[in-house]
């Protein structure tokens, strides 16, 4: 029996007497886009931090390829192939695109104590990987701050894919972007899916989710209140579920 790439089983996260997430069960498969939707205060931020290894679940199971895991830090999650692109992107605006692409993972050449950065190779890889995602860079030396918000998201996605992500968690990647830039980001979400990555798309925008999603989970007040598969999902129903909020609690179907 094939296991999902990532699975949460009845996960709860509490902080003292405050329960931030409760009864969260989701499945995330390779080469699919799983959308987790919810308005402000729905519990998305806590769930992202649990998925990315910032928080440990208080209850329930976290499985990666069928094996229960216990992450102590985001580095543990990253080592397991779970990469997260947060809203702030963790890029340095005044640093070049290629330096941002390899920051913390620089390629060196030389031997023994005599080592230096292999700048040429890193520039070549940056161009190749971005081109594979459909981004034709003018110059990898340009500061990443000169790129649009959508293009910076694309660089962050390509970086995660190159460094071995099996699961890519995107935290509100289209938030605060215009129509054109949102379209650019959604294009690269699908490009990651086509490369076999299991994508988790966190958003409060049902229209953006419906354009790329294969599976949809709706959160409200920290609980999973509805789930849909692409084959049975309807944009109007998804939008109504988002707008209905508490009226949807207790309804779940696949």
Give, region by region, the residue ranges found by the protein language model.
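Glycine-rich phosphate-binding loops of nucleotide-dependent enzymes
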Residues: 2-251
């Amino acid at each position: 029996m094939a296991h999902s790439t990532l699975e949460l089983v009845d996960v709860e996260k509490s902080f003292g007497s405050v329960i931030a997430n409760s009864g969260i069960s989701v499945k995330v498969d390779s080469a699919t886009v799983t959308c987790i939707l919810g308005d402000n205060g729905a519990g998305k931020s806590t769930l992202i931090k649990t998925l990315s290894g910032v928080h440990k679940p208080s209850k329930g199971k976290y499985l990666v390829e069928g094996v229960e895991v216990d992450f102590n830090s985001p580095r543990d999650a990253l080592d397991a192939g779970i990469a997260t692109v947060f809203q702030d992107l963790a890029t340095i605006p005044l640093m070049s695109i290629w330096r941002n692409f390899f920051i913390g993972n620089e390629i060196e050449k030389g031997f023994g104590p005599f080592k230096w950065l292999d700048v040429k190779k890193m520039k070549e890889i940056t161009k190749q990987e971005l081109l594979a995602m459909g981004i034709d860079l003018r110059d990898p030396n340009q500061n990443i701050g000169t790129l649009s918000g959508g293009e910076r998201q694309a660089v962050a996605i390509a970086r995660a894919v190159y460094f071995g992500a099996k699961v890519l968690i995107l935290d509100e990647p289209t938030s605060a972007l215009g129509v054109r830039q949102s379209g650019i980001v959604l294009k690269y979400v699908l490009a990651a899916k086509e490369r076999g990555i299991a994508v988790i798309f966190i958003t409060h925008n049902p229209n953006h989710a419906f354009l790329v999603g294969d599976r949809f989970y709706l959160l409200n007040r920290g609980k999973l209140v509805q789930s849909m598969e692409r084959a049975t999902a309807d944009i109007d129903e998804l939008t109504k579920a988002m707008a209905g909020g508490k009226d949807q609690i207790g309804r779940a179907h696949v």
